[in-house]
Amino acid sequence: MRVLVIFIPKSFPNKCLHFKKLGLWIIFQASIKEKSNHQKEILTEQQQQQIINNHINNSISSENLVIPLNNYEESPTQSNISSCYSSQSNLSSYSSTGSLSSYYGSNYYHGASSSSISSINSNIANSNSSSTGRDSTPTPTPTPIQTPSSTPSKKKRSWRIRTPSPKPKLESNNNHHHNHHNYYNNFSEISIELPPTPTYPQKPSFLSNSNQIPRPKSRHSHTNSADSYTSSYSSTYPSSTRSSQKQPPYYQQPINNKNNNNNNNINNFNFNGNNNNNNNNNNNNNNNNNNNNNNNNNNNNNNSNNMKISTSPNKLSNSNHSTNSNFSQCSSSHSLLDTNIGGINVNTQNLVSFTNETSNSGSTIIKPVALKSSSRSVFNSSNNQQYLFSSSTLSSSSSTKTNNNSTTTTTTTTAKTSSTSTNDYSSIKGKSLIDDDASCSISSFNAIEQQVLIPTVLSSSSSSHVMKRSNGSSNGGNSTIQSPSCNQISINKNNLVDIDDEDEDDEDDINGHWEKITIPSNMCRDQISIKNNFDESTKVIC
């Protein structure tokens, strides 16, 4: 520790004032008057010896010791040092310019040889107990002089708390390098037991893509569209086997017509749970038609026949409105709408494929009816009827299931007569769009706008045949054309859309604003073309 001793003249009342400031003890001490030089030297030696002893006890180097420069002679009338702190009024501090001398050293106190702070405190207690009052003029006490310390003391260094080394103690060994490696080897010897790695069974190869069923190899497997995969699946597995298996999902992707030649099944119209088997086997086709008729009677309330026209070609989308028509003995029908003025649109949207069937009585031809609509009305007459199919490229049969579930009827007529197209229907509301003589009827209800069906074409061929619209005669081919029966053509009035709603002029309706063409659920395998005589345009639809 450091002590600053200030010698004050004997006229000062506070003879033993001391305090600690910033870790430095400051002591005010009365001066001692030396009578002779010899006595002065003796006092000086005594002070030096006392300082050295204090230095040894407090572990302070002798370089920090400063010997007092001025030692006043002790007067005979020197007051006793025990007169410190005689009164509280004398403890006020004043500034003075008296003779002061700075002193650096350890615990130094006049008349005491103690080397600790406790000795100073004991002296203060003794001085307070034996203090005597002394009248003297109050003089200001001098301001203590503090000198900055440049070097820290060793005692402060000993106060620092040192954390123990994290390195564990090792057994004494002469080879220090060996001990260094032994320390790190101790950690490597720790064994950590991990749980066993779980083993899972190997995933089968056919379940690599869980969203698809294993794709069978067929002649249509080279196509890139998703609908061709659906058709190849249905054509590979028979209907009896396919009913117990998982059906492929419904795809809504465009169809590449050129890569789907002779694919005679519309799998996107799988509303009844069973599709027509397309193996060109007449017996299987007739059985599947009967199954479709049975399923229509049971599932017509649960299945939807409404589909919207999408902007992309040949893309089907389910409608939010379900068909509520009562199909007694009719198969499911699918509508075809014209979105362009002057004829049926040929932007690969209105292409239809049908099933090739022959009956016992001979080959027949299916003729769908082309309907015109304006202000929610249907106009159809013999002068404006249009035959969409060629007898030379298409043959099919219509099987109508009767009540006894055993007979199959076939109706054949000429091209100039038709049992379903000669009736003039003026309005949709309250009327049945099928002839009264037909074997079934559709319940009437109001038409809903913007609900349109468009079928997807899965087959086409290189042959094309242009049909004319003159009294129902075809451009090439003299064979008879069958008037479609009830199970072949049915009209879904919920899907009729009035394109020309604001125009009430009948003259504009003659321009051939074909709104809807209904087609049967059976499919053909040949290409179909139609011609609209209003604007002399020929468009291929199959």
Swiss-Prot record:
Region (Disordered): 125-182, 194-333, 390-428, 459-487
Coiled coil (residue ranges): none
Compositional bias segments (type: Polar residues): 202-213
Biased composition (Low complexity): 125-138, 228-306, 314-333, 390-423, 459-479
Entry protein name: Uncharacterized protein DDB_G0275275
Record organism: Dictyostelium discoideum
